[in-house]
Amino acid sequence: MPMTMSQAFIGNFLGNSPKWYKIAILSFLIINPILFFYVSPFVAGWVLVLEFIFTLAMALKCYPLQPGGLLAIEAVAIGMTSASQVLHEIEANLEVLLLLVFMVAGIYFMKQLLLFAFTKMITKVRSKILVSLLFCLASAFLSAFLDALTVIAVIITVAVGFYSIYHKVASGKDFSADHDHTSENKNEEGEDQLNEAELESFRGFLRNLLMHAGVGTALGGVCTMVGEPQNLIIAAQANWQFGEFAIRMSPVTVPVFIAGILTCYIVEKFRIFGYGAQLPDAVHKILCDYDAHEDARRTNKDKMKLIVQAFIGVWLIAGLALHLASVGLIGLSVIILATAFNGITDEHALGKAFEEALPFTALLAVFFSVVAVIIDQQLFAPVIQWALNHEGNTQLVIFYIANGLLSMVSDNVFVGTVYINEVKAALLNGQITRDQFDLLAVAINTGTNLPSVATPNGQAAFLFLLTSALAPLIRLSYGRMVWMALPYTIVLSIVGVMAIQIGFLEQMTQYFYDSHAILHHSVKEALAPATGH
């Protein structure tokens, strides 16, 4: 029986997604205008946010760009926000978009060096606990200077490299052969080709390392003003420079960092929350053989490429630490330097570098349209006003918790931006003192960065990982990410809130003032045009 036009429409709509998912998205598109016009724009706004979170949670059923984009287009069409407000949000976050377009592509051209370094780390260090700690620490260090997305892009590149090497050899091919590592584990006769238990164990091992690395980016990213995009925004509003930002954050970030590393050790030691997966001996042997094979066939030309990439890595860290240009422009310089000095001049070879990041860049632009709805419908206004009604230490704790809860379900760049703007308005209105504003800025920054590891919605790096080509290969779903992040979420959130609650933040800040490590700022300084560079 031939397919009817309506069946063809449903079949084409959102492609291979499950039928129930397609019906859910169509239902959302019907419900939203009814809620907006006949119930309340405020209710419709929150429903839209929840629907968008649903599309993110179902990222493995359907990439969120299409369903989320349809919801966003409808929101603009019915007047929940305007196209100009969406454009304003994209303009305000241009650095984040440039970061995604250029920095992630730049890292693609440095992956030989990164694969070299991390392969040595995994082949030379046999202890799983030690490898986990190394990945967590390396990610934390890198993300203090690079954006967390950049670091996760690095780790994803490394993991895909490991997975494809194993898949290629286990499928009976040599290292140099072409091979599709995304194919199912069957040969031409339809028989299983790969050892299923071995493959599952290796997937578990890679999942563990990626989650440790992901949390590592949060641990390091909260410490410096270049660690996360929202840190830049908060530092600019408070007129803090690189050193002052790190010092002011340290009463919260140092205890949290220590607790995070201890959590990494404990979950691996006791094999809880899905951790403790070991690297099978057979896989370890393949990776060691590959390492030896690569070392043996490495020519002077190849060695020169690694040296050039190492120098570019130094420029990358120095350029970001000293804030010599915006993050995206430094990423563009990395692309130019890496391709020019390593002889990559073919347009098609350049194009491959952008494949990973551009769908996510488009998704982020769609997310900014949801942010525009949140602003136009003032969805967060009641929470912010309630928090400002409290005083002193209680106010700091409330802002930390309120930031944390909203960052778990919303983009932390947005949450941080909204809160720091509201608090700055309160400062200029005389509701709070300048010293209280500085403490609130610390609470907002740490509250935005730390509890948001709970879900991929809060951490852009986690969302990038979830929607990457690697996630389905290693069976890393939304639910599994939330479960594996849970011990970190609990520990980081509690240690962070305790550092504020017991007065440690206030006492240490006073100590820094007394020892002249930092100086008191005036309200007048907050009126000066904010500069992030």
Swiss-Prot record:
It is a multi-pass membrane protein. Keywords: Antiport, Cell inner membrane, Cell membrane, Ion transport, Membrane, Sodium, Sodium transport, Transmembrane, Transmembrane helix, Transport. It is found in: Cell inner membrane. GO terms for molecular function: sodium:proton antiporter activity. The chain crosses the membrane at residues 10-30, 67-87, 96-116, 131-165, 209-229, 247-267, 310-330, 355-375, 396-416, 454-474, 485-505. GO terms for cellular component: plasma membrane. It catalyses: 2 Na(+)(in) + 3 H(+)(out) = 2 Na(+)(out) + 3 H(+)(in). HAMAP family: NhaB (MF_01599). Belongs to the NhaB Na(+)/H(+) (TC 2.A.34) antiporter family. Na(+)/H(+) antiporter that extrudes sodium in exchange for external protons. This is Na(+)/H(+) antiporter NhaB. The lineage of its organism: Bacteria, Pseudomonadati, Pseudomonadota, Gammaproteobacteria, Alteromonadales.
